[in-house]
């Protein structure tokens, strides 16, 4: 019957269907793959054909037929579906399978105002011919189906109204490289462009969404994370709101420190009126966050930070839950509770926590971050001052409420502010850490703005990227990769534009980077070690020692070449203090691996030449970009050997790397009996990482009596994380049984890990 069907071609011409042509394309897409049935894909497709069907719909039907066959027994369908999609995208972009040459493509795209004019200004035609020779378009065939769909949905330049695609992946990679090294000397820039292109197009380095989606376009804002602090006055609150709108519209995820805002009922202007409290202003922030999508790529998102001793804490902890009414809930942001040693001590000793409005207790709020001894002294003093409004609550009640809300929403995060400042890249006396970002991996100094043009405020930005651990042949590879990644991200800081002066001043003075990892689960599987039993501890120590060492060394080399960052004196590195000096020594009880690299030589070099960047490392979530690299997410264990990830492009099946060879080596999330092994590994990483880690906790209620997670277990894991020096905790994942109908190795995963915000890669 199909032989008599007519089809409408892309050019509008109608002709008889050519099944031989379809089979030729299917044969091409299946070449070299195992366990593929071309006839099965053809059969599944043809039953959906109809008269006058468009050839574009035929192509999409074939792609879906192949993608639906991705399974445990036939994982190679992910590559067949990917190749068919690449073919389809190239036809949409170029009208043919073979891409044009780079120079003609760039000229055309600049004419269409899709690419930045500087590409033609900075590079003569001869350079484009050289860059064109670097491009390996066949690398498009290394993408998995999930990767190609993410490219299509988020990263390739397109008209989001008409769905017109304008480029292919290799053009994206070469032009990102060209943009980043455009100001390098003529004699070296082609070398760096080629090396960086090779590293990103072969998935050795993973780039964040703002860079992948925007770098090469006229829009120049590529920092993934923005940290904004609000003061306790209307001018500052409104300046914060303005800053949020500007950055959300430009692809950034937001961290908002609202901890200074005074409590409900506090006096204003010596009692002229009473304060409305935090919630109305949180709603104000929420409206700003949701006012824009992030450059058409994803919706805005933010995390708000406040201390556990805030007078309104009981109302703030429940803002995200589904109970209550609209007036007393602010559900469309996430929240992070700030803790320190004194608060944990009150819990352990069965004592009370006293709640204050920050406006009533001079210097308490600032000392909470920059001086723990002073904080404890002032806190006890104010507890005994009968003239100050306060409320005493049992520490066990407050921690239980916090952990209950963390469990029910999954999105109440933890920041240990003392660890953030004692094990910091920054000197807390000069540049204290008072908040984190959307996903809790960034710890940078901030200062509230009084208006959006305030030169004295500080909005902190962090530019992210990640090393693909699965691509390493050995730890020596990290030297070259670190050099490339530090140079590239440092160039981003000079290349991008800054909508707010205080952000520009901070970014160019501190030059902070956050370089993390992807594919850690594959790295463990490849090395035959596991999350849960301690077998990965020493490997993790050696790996993250090498990562931080080589990143610092690369930044020091760049400082010799271009100068140290202007505010290098604000860092502990300036004093010769390294992460290996300030980590929580309890880590030594779980890992006795010695240091293997010459840290004393590095210390001398840093003291002599400085660093180009105030910070180098942060371990972020990477749900989307890890799919591009066909890698596992960040440091997380996979939920299944084949995960079905819900995204706006539909259900995407992603297979773990080297499934056939290593399927018995992977330790899946819900097969890990408890959080202890994971928290130990995270603490070993934190020993070296100079910012923080988006570390999660995970619970399967079926492992506990009556299918209920005991509060004692939740608190125990929280205390373990603190004892081992973790600065932050991100999501709490609770197994809900939604995936029980799948086979053991196929798990659903909502693509929510930092899905709306850009603080992931």
From Swiss-Prot:
- Reported EC number(s) for this entry are 1.17.4.1
Q: How is its activity regulated?
A: Under complex allosteric control mediated by deoxynucleoside triphosphates and ATP binding to separate specificity and activation sites on the alpha subunit. The type of nucleotide bound at the specificity site determines substrate preference. It seems probable that ATP makes the enzyme reduce CDP and UDP, dGTP favors ADP reduction and dTTP favors GDP reduction. Stimulated by ATP and inhibited by dATP binding to the activity site.
Location of the active site: 437, 439, 441
Q: List the disulfide bonds.
A: 225-462
Domain ATP-cone: start-end pairs? 5-95
Site feature Important for electron transfer, where: 730-731
PROSITE patterns per the record?
ATP_CONE, RIBORED_LARGE
Q: Where are the transmembrane segments?
A: none
Quote the cellular component terms of the Gene Ontology held in the record.
ribonucleoside-diphosphate reductase complex
Site description Interacts with thioredoxin/glutaredoxin, residues in chain: 754, 759
Task: Give the GO molecular function terms.
Answer: ATP binding; ribonucleoside-diphosphate reductase activity, thioredoxin disulfide as acceptor
Which reaction is recorded as catalysed by this protein? a 2'-deoxyribonucleoside 5'-diphosphate + [thioredoxin]-disulfide + H2O = a ribonucleoside 5'-diphosphate + [thioredoxin]-dithiol
Q: What class of enzyme is it?
A: oxidoreductase
BP terms from Gene Ontology: deoxyribonucleotide biosynthetic process
Q: Which InterPro entries match?
A: ATP-cone_dom, NrdE_NrdA_C, RNR_lg_C, RNR_lsu_N, RNR_R1-su_N, Rrm1
Amino-acid positions noted as binding dTTP in the UniProt annotation, renumbered to this chain: 232-234, 262, 269
- Keywords recorded for this protein, A-Z: Allosteric enzyme, ATP-binding, Deoxyribonucleotide synthesis, Disulfide bond, Nucleotide-binding, Oxidoreductase
Gene3D superfamilies, sorted: 1.10.1650.20, 3.20.70.20
Q: Which domain of life is it from?
A: Bacteria
Q: Residues that bind ATP, according to the entry?
A: 9, 15-21, 55, 91
Q: Indicate which residues the UniProt annotation says bind GDP.
A: 209, 437, 441, 623-625
The entry's function note states: Provides the precursors necessary for DNA synthesis. Catalyzes the biosynthesis of deoxyribonucleotides from the corresponding ribonucleotides.
Q: Which NCBIfam families match?
A: NrdE_NrdA, PRK09103.1
Q: How does it assemble?
A: Tetramer of two alpha and two beta subunits.
Family of this protein: Belongs to the ribonucleoside diphosphate reductase large chain family.
Q: What is this protein called?
A: Ribonucleoside-diphosphate reductase subunit alpha
What organism is recorded for this protein? Buchnera aphidicola subsp. Baizongia pistaciae (strain Bp)
Source organism phylogeny: Bacteria, Pseudomonadati, Pseudomonadota, Gammaproteobacteria, Enterobacterales
């Amino acid at each position: 019957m199909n032989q008599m069907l007519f089809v409408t071609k892309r050019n509008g011409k109608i002709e008889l269907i050519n099944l031989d042509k379809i089979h030729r394309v299917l044969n091409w897409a299946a070449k070299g793959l195992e366990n593929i049935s071309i006839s099965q894909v053809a059969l599944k497709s043809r039953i959906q054909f109809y008269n006058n069907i468009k050839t574009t719909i035929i192509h999409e039907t074939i792609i879906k037929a192949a993608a639906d066959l991705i399974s445990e027994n036939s994982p190679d369908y992910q590559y067949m579906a990917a190749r068919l999609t690449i073919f389809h995208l190239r036809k949409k972009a170029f009208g043919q399978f073979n891409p044009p040459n780079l120079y003609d493509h760039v000229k055309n795209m600049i004419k269409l105002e899709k690419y930045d004019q500087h590409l033609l200004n900075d590079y003569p035609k001869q350079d484009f011919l050289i860059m064109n020779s670097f491009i390996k378009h066949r690398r498009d065939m290394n993408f998995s189906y999930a990767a190609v769909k993410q490219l299509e949905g988020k990263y390739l330049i397109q008209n989001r109204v008409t769905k017109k695609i304008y480029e292919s992946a290799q053009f994206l990679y070469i032009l990102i490289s060209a943009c980043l090294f455009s100001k390098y000397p003529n004699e070296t820039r082609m070398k760096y462009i080629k090396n960086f292109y090779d590293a990103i197009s072969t998935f050795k380095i993973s780039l964040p969404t703002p860079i992948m989606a925007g770098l090469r376009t006229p829009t120049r804002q590529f920092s993934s994370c923005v940290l904004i602090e609000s003061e306790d006055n209307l001018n500052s609150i409104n300046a914060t709101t303005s800053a949020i709108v500007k950055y959300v519209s430009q692809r950034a995820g937001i961290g908002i420190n609202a901890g200074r805002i005074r409590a409900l009922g506090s006096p204003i202007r010596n009692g002229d009126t009473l304060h409305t409290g935090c919630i109305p202003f949180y709603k104000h922030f929420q409206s700003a966050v949701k006012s824009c999508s992030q450059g058409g790529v994803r919706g805005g998102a933010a995390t708000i930070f406040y201390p556990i001793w805030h007078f309104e804490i009981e109302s703030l902890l429940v803002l995200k839950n589904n109970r209550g009414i609209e007036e007393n809930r602010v559900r469309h942001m996430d929240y992070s509770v700030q803790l320190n040693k004194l608060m944990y001590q009150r819990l352990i000793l069965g004592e009370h926590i006293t709640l204050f409005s920050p406006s009533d207790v001079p210097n308490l709020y600032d000392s909470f971050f920059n001086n723990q001894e002073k904080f404890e002294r002032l806190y006890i003093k104010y507890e005994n001052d009968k003239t100050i409004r306060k409320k005493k609550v049992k520490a066990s009640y407050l921690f239980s409420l916090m952990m209950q809300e963390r469990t029910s929403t999954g999105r109440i995060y933890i920041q240990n502010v003392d660890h953030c400042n004692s094990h910091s890249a920054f000197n807390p006396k000069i540049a204290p850490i008072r908040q984190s970002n959307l996903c809790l991996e960034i710890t940078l100094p901030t200062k509230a703005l009084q208006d959006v043009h305030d030169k004295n405020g500080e909005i902190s930005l962090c530019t992210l990227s990640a090393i693909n651990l699965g691509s390493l042949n050995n730890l020596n590879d990290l030297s070259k990769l670190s050099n490339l990644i530090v140079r590239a991200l440092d160039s981003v800081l000079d290349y991008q534009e800054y909508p707010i002066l205080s952000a520009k001043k901070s970014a160019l003075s501190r030059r902070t980077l956050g370089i993390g990892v992807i594919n850690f689960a594959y790295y463990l599987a490849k090395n035959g070690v596991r999350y849960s039993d301690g077998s990965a501890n020493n490997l993790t120590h050696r790996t993250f020692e090498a990562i931080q060492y080589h990143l610092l060394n690369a930044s020091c080399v760049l400082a010799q070449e271009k100068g140290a960052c202007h505010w290098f004196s604000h860092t502990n590195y300036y004093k010769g203090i390294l992460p290996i000096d300030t980590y929580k020594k309890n880590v030594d009880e779980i890992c006795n691996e010695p240091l293997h690299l010459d840290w004393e030589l590095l210390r001398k070099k840093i003291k002599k030449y400085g660093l180009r960047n105030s910070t180098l490392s942060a371990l972020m979530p990477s749900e989307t970009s890890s799919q591009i690299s066909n890698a596992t997410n960040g440091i997380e264990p996979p939920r299944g050997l084949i995960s079905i990830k819900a995204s706006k492009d539909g259900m995407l099946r992603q297979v773990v790397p080297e499934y056939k060879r290593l399927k018995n080596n992977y330790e899946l999330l819900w097969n890990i009996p408890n959080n202890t092994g994971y928290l130990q590994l995270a603490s070993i990483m934190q020993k070296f990482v100079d910012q923080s880690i988006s570390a999660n906790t995970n619970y399967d209620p079926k492992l506990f009596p009556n299918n209920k997670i005991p509060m004692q277990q939740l608190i125990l894991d929280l205390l373990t994380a603190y004892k081992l020096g973790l600065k932050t905790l991100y999501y709490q994942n609770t197994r809900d049984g939604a995936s029980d109908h799948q086979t053991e190795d196929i798990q659903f995963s909502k693509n929510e890990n930092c899905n709306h915000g850009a603080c992931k890669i």
